[in-house]
């Protein structure tokens, strides 16, 4: 008898287009019963711009709406939202905003047993779709199992209004799939770790798709952002299929997490991932110059100075990256890089 299995939870509804925020009520009602209570989790800036539009659309569909404003993405905040959802018997928790709001809503909905709806206002990373959440307060800065969204509602017009830097960070996060899949294959060969070809191919397709449209994305056109968003959704779905973050997160993400620990000035997640991908592509013997060229095309950082971090911080991050998730085998090996090897890698690739 074949006993190996894993569960795949996928979104029921994915909508990407112009003006869809004002139609969100119809999409949310498709995954919730009429009269359901929808708790919108959002930050102060985003909620002041978009909450009233979202509420009007939800209430037009007979849904009751509440707002929970958060200021950080910590376990404590997420647990607070979960308690409120449980005590008030809230059926739907919607994340409106960037990574913080979506990660908190995602985690809280799992804890409360509520339906989760993802409504991103920036295209900064693929967490808009994935069933994993990144929160501060755990022992290590890694993604934890949460809940896949039942519905994803992405208004391209809203995304286009976001600071360009955040959307370009999403490009960096997607470029990281090139090395993430290489690391996954390596772990399969050397550690007999489960490897799913379909999930890996889907993640790679996301990276290849935005690579082909790099110039359009650089221009910040609606079409360019639509391609970026669809690729982020696709990458998130690859994690749903794999049942882990493996197809989307490898050594380049370990570097990014490590850099966030050691750097005084914190770059955006996708920015750090992009720079990490340059170096990890070199270690894999791949065309790291092409990776750097793609990042330059869209205006993403390619070195420490552009990231706003110190050279020594990059080197230190490289030396501790393998210890962020010791159970996750990557090109960095079990013990990671020595300081000498880390500095040589960063210099060879022009990161420092």
From Swiss-Prot:
InterPro entries: G1P_dehydrogenase_arc (IPR023002), G1PDH (IPR032837), Glycerol_DH (IPR016205). Optimum temperature is 94-96 degrees Celsius. Over 96 degrees Celsius, the activity decreases dramatically. Hyperthermostable. The half-life of activity is 30 minutes at 95 degrees Celsius and increases to 2 hours at 90 degrees Celsius. One of its GO terms (biological process) is phospholipid biosynthetic process. HAMAP family: G1P_dehydrogenase_A. Belongs to the glycerol-1-phosphate dehydrogenase family. Catalyzes the NAD(P)H-dependent reduction of dihydroxyacetonephosphate (DHAP or glycerone phosphate) to glycerol 1-phosphate (G1P). The G1P thus generated is used as the glycerophosphate backbone of phospholipids in the cellular membranes of Archaea. Is also able to catalyze the reverse reaction, i.e. the NAD(+)-dependent oxidation of G1P but not of G3P. Is not active toward glycerol, dihydroxyacetone, glyceraldehyde phosphate, and glycerol-2-phosphate. This is Glycerol-1-phosphate dehydrogenase [NAD(P)+]. It comes from Aeropyrum pernix (strain ATCC 700893 / DSM 11879 / JCM 9820 / NBRC 100138 / K1). The gene is egsA.
């Amino acid at each position: 008898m074949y006993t190996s299995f894993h569960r795949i939870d996928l979104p029921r509804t994915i909508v990407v287009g112009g003006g869809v925020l004002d139609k969100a009520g119809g999409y949310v009602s498709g995954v919730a019963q009429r009269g359901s209570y929808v708790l919108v989790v959002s930050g102060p800036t985003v909620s002041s711009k978009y909450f009233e539009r979202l509420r009007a659309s939800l209430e037009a569909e007979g849904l009751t709406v509440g707002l929970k404003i958060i200021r950080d993405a910590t376990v404590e905040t997420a647990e607070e939202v979960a308690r409120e959802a449980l005590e008030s018997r809230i059926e739907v928790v919607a994340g409106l905003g960037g990574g913080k709001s979506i990660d908190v809503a995602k985690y809280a909905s799992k804890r409360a047993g509520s339906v989760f709806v993802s409504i991103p206002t920036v295209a900064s990373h693929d967490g808009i779709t994935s069933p994993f959440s990144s929160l501060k307060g755990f022992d290590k800065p890694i993604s934890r199992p949460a809940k896949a969204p039942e519905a994803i509602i992405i208004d391209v017009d809203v995304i286009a209004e976001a600071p360009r830097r955040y959307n370009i960070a999403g490009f960096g996060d997607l470029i990281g799939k090139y090395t993430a899949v290489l690391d996954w294959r390596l772990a399969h060969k050397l550690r007999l770790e489960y490897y799913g070809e379909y999930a890996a191919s889907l993640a790679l397709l996301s990276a290849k798709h935005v690579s082909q449209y790099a110039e359009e994305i650089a221009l910040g056109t609606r079409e360019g952002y639509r391609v970026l968003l669809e690729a982020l959704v696709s990458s998130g779905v690859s994690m749903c299929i794999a049942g882990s973050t493996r197809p989307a997160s490898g050594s380049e993400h370990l570097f990014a997490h490590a850099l966030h620990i050691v750097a005084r000035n914190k770059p955006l997640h996708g920015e750090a991932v992009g720079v990490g991908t340059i170096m990890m592509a070199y270690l894999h013997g791949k065309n790291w110059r092409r990776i750097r060229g793609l990042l330059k095309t869209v205006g993403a950082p390619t070195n420490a100075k552009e990231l706003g971090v110190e050279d020594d911080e990059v080197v230190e991050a490289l030396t501790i990256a393998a210890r962020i998730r010791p159970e996750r085998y990557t090109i960095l090996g079990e013990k990671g890089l020595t300081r000498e090897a880390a500095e040589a890698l960063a210099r060879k690739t022009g990161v420092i």
